Amino acid sequence: IKQLDGAIGYLNYGYVVNSNDFQQVSLQNKAGNYVTANAETSAAGLSQIVLDDQLRGADANHAGANAYPIVSLTWVLAYPESKTGVKETLRYMLSEKAQAMSDGLGYVPLPEDLRQKALAAVETLQ
């Protein structure tokens, strides 16, 4: 994208928010509003993803007035009988402290309901 003058592309939130090399455009969401990606608009999009009991979900382009239309979750695969430290690492990643650092690292803090669902899944690990 950077090498071709006038190129349009899609980048992970972290590449845009932590770089002066790329310009961001506003995208029209289903509600008809033009929004740019930031922690607030991305979280608004994430908060509308409906997850089943296996934490699977789709269609992140919901009609929230302030929702950024292109959002996705980052998934972690952990086996029920995981190695020592996996459960503790995932607990930390989902902690309020770690979530508070997310935006500065180029990630969007999880909405509280998604964070709680993920924590419940972590607790099933042995």
Model segments located where?
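Exported/periplasmic ABC-transporter solute-binding proteins
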Residues: 1-126
